[in-house]
Amino acid sequence: MATTQSVTRIKKGLDLPITGCPEQHMEAGPAIRQVALLGDDYIGMKPTMLVSAGDRVVLGQPVFEDKKTPGVIYTAPASGTVVDVVRGAKRKFEAVVIDVDNDSTETTTIDGIAGSDPISIAREKLVDGLVQIGLWSAFRTRPFGKVPTIESRPHSIFVTAIDTNPLAADPAVVLADRKDQFVIGLQALTRLTDGAVHLCQAEKASIPGGDVAGVQSASFAGPHPAGLPGTHIHHLDPVSLNKTVWYIGYQDVIAIGSFLQTGQLDTRRVISLAGPKVNQPRLIETRLGACIDELIDGEVDTSVKLRVISGSVLNGHIATAPHQFLGRYDNQVSVIEEGDHREFLGWQKPGFDKFSVSRIFASAMTPDRKFDFTSSTGGSERAMVPLGTYEKVMPMDILATQLLRALIVRDTDSAQQLGVLELEEEDLALCTFVCPGKYEYGSLIRENLTTIEREG
């Protein structure tokens, strides 16, 4: 029988008081004319290309295979024509761009999958089907955040059905019309691990699947990062070099359930289109890899220079060419003003319109106020100063200041002892936000994790 765990209450963290929160109701998005697979979405992946510019592809057709994890296939998110295989410096793979044929009904169907019983399906058959249709890449490992190898088995699997990122969609709203497919997907996940499937959700959230055998429902409450998989894993099943868990987003669980019903790839994705510069912040239904330029056309304030972000304002990627597409694991598009201008004598002003974690501005007198955040860092990089700000936003049992210092000096031995293997870029996004030294800890932790993995 399924089990229910008590609520884990997070006290440390920060809910960013940003304007432009989305209305929690869904609308159909525009018909997308171009989609892409982005190389940076898949850590450590080295592609063997199976298509080239000018080739015709159908939905679910393999477009490249990973040299580093043999057999793992990445498939086309739409039917159409490959218009470009973008490469950057030193021929680094950037993107495969596809012009969508919205009139096409062609799709790849995996034989023997449609109508399969998710409870009794053979693990080998399920794994083979997920790999062939391209859904294997929905899983990521902790530690390191990579797509798992086909032969691996996780100690447990975490389903993230809670989202505390700024401007995020409510998973309960997205799941309301697709509960059956979500439950089927959960049942299938229990076939992939001998351990538990942890269904992580907000306190009192109406998330289906808690009664599925092999699923443990876990509730989390508190400020961001209460909704991040790193927080859940830390509290429920901590990892190490010799212990790996997988995590997956709730919309990918829906896609797995749909795959078991039809044998086909479901690329529907509900995202939050929100932020201070969005005219009508709301949830829209689009597709995997959608061109963000098309999503925001006519939706944003163009009177100022904008920064458009695929993902959270805390940890998303800037949506400029050749990365102007929805990231594989992103459930939101955020739009803020580009903070590339200096404020004359800004340090002398009381700061009624400025937010501060340290409450040094006059805005501290209006704690419920929300702010039109920009991309400005409020200064240039400087020395790291331990003022206790990192500890305020780190809910894990980790010495934040000491760990961050180890990351800066690339002391990977100390970083491992201090818990770096439990973290990824998104787990340190708040540390970057509150850092008085203006350090970017996301890139630093990735550099350290790469070194640790390489050196064993």
Swiss-Prot record:
Keywords: Ion transport, NAD, Sodium, Sodium transport, Translocase, Transport, Ubiquinone
Reactions this protein catalyses: a ubiquinone + n Na(+)(in) + NADH + H(+) = a ubiquinol + n Na(+)(out) + NAD(+)
GO molecular function, one term: oxidoreductase activity, acting on NAD(P)H, quinone or similar compound as acceptor
GO terms classed as biological process: sodium ion transport
InterPro entries (alphabetical): NqrA, NQRA_2nd, NqrA_C_domain, NQRA_N
Pfam families: NQRA_2nd, NQRA_N, NQRA_SLBB
Keyword Ribonucleoprotein: no
Keyword Ubl conjugation applies: no
E.C. designation(s): 7.2.1.1
Subunit structure: Composed of six subunits; NqrA, NqrB, NqrC, NqrD, NqrE and NqrF.
Similarity comment: Belongs to the NqrA family.
Entry function: NQR complex catalyzes the reduction of ubiquinone-1 to ubiquinol by two successive reactions, coupled with the transport of Na(+) ions from the cytoplasm to the periplasm. NqrA to NqrE are probably involved in the second step, the conversion of ubisemiquinone to ubiquinol.
The protein's name in its UniProt record: Na(+)-translocating NADH-quinone reductase subunit A
